[in-house]
């Protein structure tokens, strides 16, 4: 055998071996792929889809939800009964083809099964998600329905337990409960017949009506309590109190109290009847009006009771106060009468008792009977309180004015005493001033000083004459005393000025000698000042004339002389 043939045979054998090895490798790989596909299929088969479907079945879906569930359930049935069987068939076919080394067809079957499994996986995911959505939706719907029913049942139970608290509104509340119950029944009917949208709307209304009725029923007991308990109790209390006050002889300015009681009763009854409509705002407003009427009645009674306490206390004070004021008036009258014998008293308000007497007589005739018959007259105590308070105010004013008269009376005799003391003092001062002027050895007395002196003397004389009368005019004495006091003070001041002007003029005239020989103006002023001093006795004008001339030649000289004089000035010794 030639070497070429041998090489050919060897090559063929090698190719066969290589082909076999490749076939074995491909077959092994395909076995692995088929096994993986088998595992994927088994994992899908093992998914709890059927259990989830059974759980959803237990929810008793209705309407659109039930139709949706049926579609997904049918899809799962198709997958579990047909698709998986078809995959099993193709997997067996792929195994057979792979075992027979028909790798191309085997690979085709493997790819086909892979594609089918991918589609099945996606379908199963969709099925499970749809089932979960149905479960969640049903749970929400169920929870919503349960919540609405719980609200209704709770409300129904609460109303049943507190039925007595709703008064006349109970029939309307029961009617509302029946309407809500009918709405729930309608919801169940619609839900069962597969109309979930309308059923949801009905459920919404039922829930809203339940909540609204609950809010209303929470407010009703407080309103009913006022109408059935509070107001009647207050009205009974008012009527009982009114009867007791009448028995105790109370009287009221308001003459329609019985009518007001009746109006309150009618308002309570009317509001109770109107509450049937469940118009709570109107009922509350009306309750407030009723309470205001009741409060006004309480105010009337409390005002009279309080007025009684004040008026009763005042009725004990007024007689004593009146007696005290009358006693004061009598004492004042006696004192004024005594003083009238000695003094001329003008009929002025400060010493007049007429207004006091009139006030006291009016109280005695118009008020005292009410005081003495307190508790027996048919007068409201509020009226008596006002009358008595006004009376006490009048008595207080009378007493204050009486005290002023007492003070005025007390000062009358002291006015005379003080005037007599001043009279003696003023006469003495007048003599001392006269002697003081005489000692000055002046060339003459200025006319204006003489006028002041004689005027003061006349005023002192007038005071002496007034005090010498049998009956002294005390007002005239008081006036003359004041006038004389001022006159003496003015005369004393005028005396000091005259003496000062005269003394300073003499000093300045002497001092001017040092300038007269060479200052013509000083010489001229000297002559004029000397004339005013010795002839006209106008010491003030003389001082002004010479001081002005000296100031022109020696500024400040006048102040120097004035200061020196003031330090050594002689005072009148009274």
Swiss-Prot record:
Localisation per UniProt entry: Cell membrane
Pfam families noted in UniProt: EzrA (PF06160)
GO biological process: division septum assembly; septin ring assembly
Domain of life: Bacteria
Swiss-Prot/TrEMBL keywords: Cell cycle, Cell division, Cell membrane, Coiled coil, Membrane, Septation, Transmembrane, Transmembrane helix
Subcellular location, principal: membrane
One GO cellular component term noted in the UniProt record for this chain: plasma membrane
TM regions (residue ranges): 8-26
Extracellular topological segments: 1-7
Membrane-protein topology: Single-pass membrane protein
Topological domain ranges for the Cytoplasmic compartment: 27-574
Coiled coil: 104-141, 275-343, 473-525
UniProt similarity note: Belongs to the EzrA family.
Function (record text): Negative regulator of FtsZ ring formation; modulates the frequency and position of FtsZ ring formation. Inhibits FtsZ ring formation at polar sites. Interacts either with FtsZ or with one of its binding partners to promote depolymerization.
Protein name: Septation ring formation regulator EzrA
């Amino acid at each position: 055998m030639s070497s070429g043939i041998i090489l050919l045979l060897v090559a063929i054998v090698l190719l066969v071996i290589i082909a076999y090895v490749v076939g074995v490798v491909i077959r092994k790989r395909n076995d692995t792929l088929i096994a993986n596909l088998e595992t994927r299929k088994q994992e899908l088969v093992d998914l709890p889809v059927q259990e989830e479907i059974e759980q959803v079945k237990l929810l008793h879906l209705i309407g659109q939800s039930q139709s949706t569930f049926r579609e997904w359930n049918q899809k799962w049935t198709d997958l579990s009964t047909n698709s998986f069987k078809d995959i099993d068939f193709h997997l067996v076919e792929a195994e057979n083809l792979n075992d027979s080394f028909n790798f191309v067809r085997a690979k085709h079957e493997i790819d086909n099964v892979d594609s089918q499994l991918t589609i099945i996986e996606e379908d199963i995911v969709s099925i499970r998600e749809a089932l979960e959505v149905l479960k969640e939706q049903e749970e929400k719907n169920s929870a919503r329905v349960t919540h609405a029913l719980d609200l209704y049942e709770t409300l129904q139970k609460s109303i049943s337990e507190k039925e007595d608290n709703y008064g006349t509104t109970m029939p309307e509340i029961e009617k509302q409960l029946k309407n809500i119950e009918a709405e729930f029944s309608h919801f169940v009917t619609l839900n069962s017949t597969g109309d979930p949208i309308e059923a949801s709307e009905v459920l919404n209304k039922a829930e809203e009506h339940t909540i609204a009725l609950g809010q209303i029923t929470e407010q009703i007991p407080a309103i009913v309590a006022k109408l059935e308990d509070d107001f009647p109790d207050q009205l009974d209390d008012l009527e009982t109190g009114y009867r007791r006050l009448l028995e105790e002889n109370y009287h009221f300015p308001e003459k329609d109290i019985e009518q007001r009681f009746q109006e309150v009763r009618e308002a309570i009854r009317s509001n109770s009847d109107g509450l049937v409509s469940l118009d709570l705002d109107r009922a509350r407003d009306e309750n407030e009006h009723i309470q205001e009427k009741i409060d006004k009645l309480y105010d009337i009674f409390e005002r009279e009771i309080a007025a009684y306490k004040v008026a009763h206390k005042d009725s004990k004070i007024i007689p004593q106060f009146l007696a005290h004021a009358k006693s004061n008036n009598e004492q004042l009258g006696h004192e004024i009468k005594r003083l009238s014998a000695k003094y001329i008293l003008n009929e002025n308000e400060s010493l007049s008792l007429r207004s006091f007497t009139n006030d006291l007589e009016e109280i005695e005739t118009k008020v005292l009977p009410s005081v003495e018959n307190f508790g027996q007259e048919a007068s409201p105590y509020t009226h008596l309180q006002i009358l008595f308070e006004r009376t006490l105010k009048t008595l207080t004013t009378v007493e204050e004015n009486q005290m002023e008269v007492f003070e005025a009376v007390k000062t009358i005799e002291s006015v005379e005493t003080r005037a007599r003391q001043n009279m003696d003092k003023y006469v003495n001062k007048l003599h001392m001033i006269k002697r003081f002027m005489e000692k000055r050895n002046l060339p003459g007395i200025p006319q204006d000083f003489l006028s002041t002196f004689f005027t003061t003397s006349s005023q002192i004389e007038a005071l002496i004459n007034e005090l010498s009368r049998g009956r002294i005019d005390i007002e005239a004495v008081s006036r003359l005393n004041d006038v004389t006091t001022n006159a003496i003070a003015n005369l004393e001041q005028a005396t000091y000025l005259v003496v000062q002007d005269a003394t300073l003029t003499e000093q300045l005239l002497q001092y001017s000698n040092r300038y007269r020989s060479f200052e013509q103006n000083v010489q001229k002023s000297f002559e004029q000042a000397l004339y005013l001093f010795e002839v006209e006795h106008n010491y003030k004008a003389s001082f002004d004339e010479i001081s002005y001339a000296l100031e022109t030649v020696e500024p400040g000289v006048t102040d120097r002389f004035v200061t020196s004089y003031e330090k050594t000035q002689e005072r009148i010794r009274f």
